[in-house]
Amino acid sequence: MDVLGFICAVFLGTVVLHAKPTVRKDRVLYQDPELLRQATNEDNNSFQYDHEVFLGKEESKTFDQLSPEESKDRLSKIVDRIDGDGNSYITTDELKAWIKRVQKRYVYENVVKVWADYDLNKDNKISWEEYKQATYGYYLSNPEEFDETTDQFSFKKMLPRDERRFKRADLDGDSAANREEFTSFLHPEEFEHMKDIVVLETLEDIDKNSDGHVDEDEYIADMFAHEDRGPEPEWVKTEREQFSDFRDLNKDGKMDLDEIRHWIMPQDYDHAQAEARHLVYESDKDKDQMLTKEEILDNWNMFVGSQATNYGEDLTRNHDEL
């Protein structure tokens, strides 16, 4: 039984299940916005890039529902919130602080949305047993219905992996997660004590021969399925060069855990700072290194499509919610 069949069985009433294993496909946690922007602009597709990177594919639909007038009006109110000192100028630091606040709010609001799906006994904690039942209960009761050879992310493999992550998040060791611990379980990339787990899971996802390393072919296979056996696209050739020049730091032909960490969590890189600088650079008409509300509204399309508007959600919230 594949994952689709499993989901169908759930909705037919066999079991009520709202949860899913903690699978992540996006590897690099702190992408350089400028490098992504350059790659997209080469395809003359920068508007789509703004929507998908800053809004997300699904969240971009929210932006489409707003008229330019509505967007500008609501963005104007957001600018007032960003202007922490009330001097009518938005600095890079203020934008950076806002972007980080928005990201943090997104993480915690996501936990609020799913909390009831896991806290089965309503004691305001989620035990490992509760999480396991909510996520893997059907599989554990009906293992014969699952084809472990074809499921991309087999439940048999994901269960012990989730348990390992849960134990790392459970700082007080009581086998139950409070809200902060459960947040670190669902969003380990946001917590320093969980980042080793993120690196290890990345290795396990890509290391198909289980030798404890990621070689060049495994690195490429994670992003490109060479099904037609034809020539590789240019971007794949570029990624091979990236692997050789920047991923494989010790030049032994493969990546170890430290090199994987350097790849997905580059040191001394602040994504919020980079994004804030980009927004200022693109909107600062008088080049005084600060933005006025007028400058922001004149370039409102960029801010709608940026993390400064919480992937579009802030533009559909009431001002009092912000």
Swiss-Prot record:
GO terms for molecular function: calcium ion binding. Glycans are attached at N44. SUPFAM superfamilies: EF-hand. Ca(2+) 5 binds at D248, N250, D252, K254, E259. InterPro entries: EF-hand-dom_pair (IPR011992), EF_Hand_1_Ca_BS (IPR018247), EF_hand_dom (IPR002048), Rcn1 (IPR027241). Pfam families: EF-hand_7 (PF13499). Residues 1-19 form the signal peptide. Ca(2+) 3 binds at D170, D172, D174, E181. One of its GO terms (cellular component) is endoplasmic reticulum lumen. The keyword Endoplasmic reticulum applies. Ca(2+) 4 binds at D207, N209, D211, H213, E218. Ca(2+) 1 binds at D83, D85, N87, Y89, E94. Ca(2+) 2 binds at D119, N121, D123, K125, E130. A motif (Prevents secretion from ER) lies at residues 319-322. Ca(2+) 6 binds at D284, D286, D288, M290, E295. Keywords: Calcium, Endoplasmic reticulum, Glycoprotein, Metal-binding, Repeat, Signal. The keyword Transport does not apply. Residues 70-105, 106-141, 157-192, 194-229, 235-270, 271-306 form the EF-hand domain. It is found in: Endoplasmic reticulum lumen. May regulate calcium-dependent activities in the endoplasmic reticulum lumen or post-ER compartment. Belongs to the CREC family. This is Reticulocalbin-1. It comes from Takifugu rubripes (Japanese pufferfish).
